[in-house]
Amino acid sequence: MASILTTTEAQTRRREQYHEADVVVVGAGVFGCTMAFALANQGRSVLLLERWLKEPDRIVGELLQPGGVASLQKLGLGHCVEGIDAKPCYGYTIFYHGEKVLVPYPGIDDEGSPTHAWGGHSTGDRSTRPSGCSFHHGRFINKLRESCIAHKNITVVETEVVKTLRGEVSDQILGVESRTMNKETGKKEQDYYFGQLTIIADGYDSKWRQEVLKTKPKVCSKFYALELIDCDLPQPGHGHVIIGNAFPILLYQIGTHETRALIDVPQGIPEASPENGGVRGYIRNFVLPALPPSIRPSAEKALEDGKIPRSMPNSWLPPTKQRANGAILLGDAMNMRHPLTGGGMTVAFNDVVILSELLHPDKVGDLGDSKLINNALEELYWRRKPLTGIINVLAQALYSLFAANDRQLRALQYGCFTYFKNGDTDGPVALLAGILQRPFILAYHFFSVAFLAIWLNACSVVGCGILGIFKFPLAIIDAVLILWKACIVFIPIMWRESFQ
């Protein structure tokens, strides 16, 4: 508690001269910056360490759902999406083999809840609907870092953390060892930073995950990225999901002239083999024909450089309970989902809101008290599930449907598109947007889609002729298989993410 009550000048001197703070945060990315800022706002002294402070150039972390915007504003960082040419996002447009349906974010009531959570859609104008935004990832991160640098309780240091420091007589983590560039010699020198609590948020490729959590993410595919210039989007201000003869494609504006295209390529598919031209061959032969005609010219131009597009692995890493021994692992290092639904930053900001509340000095006076920290982590684990569980389940389940590779999944895929086309959009998109946190509504909509898929498939199999009665047993068999597939896709992930 004493370190909180010292003067700002003394805290700054401790950080800059002695490399000591209440909290050491490793990683100045989406989670690390916001966590450092939230703790500093509570009077904590924070050291924020980052290996590379130049503007990052990444292809994910560019789409922020309305729930994430609300959390960012709650943290006092809403200004970070201003002045970076961010574009508003009002919902999604889904293309299914050329046919499209608009899925706008839902209308909400005075308490912020969607007005048609269980079914149907609202008809109000945009003034009653929340919006998200999309932007260049690097510009957004720079804004977050600038806010941290300007904060009187934060010292930001460019240094590469190489290992954690433990006590001689206990396993307690006391801080980190790093390598810092000496500007005079141009060589990296050994350095040390100490804190009552070390928060590690070093991203999807965390080098501390195995040490702290002993878990590994499951990688099912990669997103290959194109940046389309002056793309003629069919529905500006909306994310576009393309479902066709290619695996899912996601497009959204990241600036006035730039549109990001993320192309899902599962591992080992023959269409992207070297004999078929590799990833570029797959994009040219399968992705371009699946795109709406207005998008193709800019996509073709983006392929002209002859290079393999940049890629990122699409991973699933369920959350893990952890016991603090002076350090905790958070952000993408602890929990990931498929980025198709653009929910990663919304999850991160929600975690920061909850954890900063649980670690408030009124509740945890001494961040070195492992018992209090562990109690906070236990509560975080369960309190985050109503939002993060839903977003994680949706990400994995929708990817399974949109990347359908068998007859039952294709039936569910068509059922999902028809469900949206019938106007049942507000509930599902409110869950996706992070503004509806009720897992049972998610289950209701998923199995409503499943039973609609069963009905549509039965109508297709039986037909309208008199001989259709003889095909009825086939429709029954299909119904069982489709329902079974829906259960396999949904229930294990729902159980793991929301109830375990």
UniProtKB/Swiss-Prot annotation:
Record has Acetylation as a keyword: no
Family recorded in the similarity comment: Belongs to the squalene monooxygenase family.
Keyword line: Endoplasmic reticulum, FAD, Flavoprotein, Lipid biosynthesis, Lipid droplet, Lipid metabolism, Membrane, Microsome, Oxidoreductase, Steroid biosynthesis, Steroid metabolism, Sterol biosynthesis, Sterol metabolism, Transmembrane, Transmembrane helix
EC nos: 1.14.14.17
EC main group: oxidoreductase
Binding locations of FAD: 30-31, 50-51, 58, 145, 332, 345
A single GO BP: ergosterol biosynthetic process
Lineage summary: Eukaryota, Fungi, Dikarya, Ascomycota, Pezizomycotina
Its job: Squalene epoxidase; part of the third module of ergosterol biosynthesis pathway that includes the late steps of the pathway. ERG1 catalyzes the epoxidation of squalene into 2,3-epoxysqualene. The third module or late pathway involves the ergosterol synthesis itself through consecutive reactions that mainly occur in the endoplasmic reticulum (ER) membrane. Firstly, the squalene synthase ERG9 catalyzes the condensation of 2 farnesyl pyrophosphate moieties to form squalene, which is the precursor of all steroids.
Gene coding for it: ERG1
Protein name: Squalene epoxidase ERG1
Localization of this protein: Microsome membrane; Endoplasmic reticulum membrane; Lipid droplet
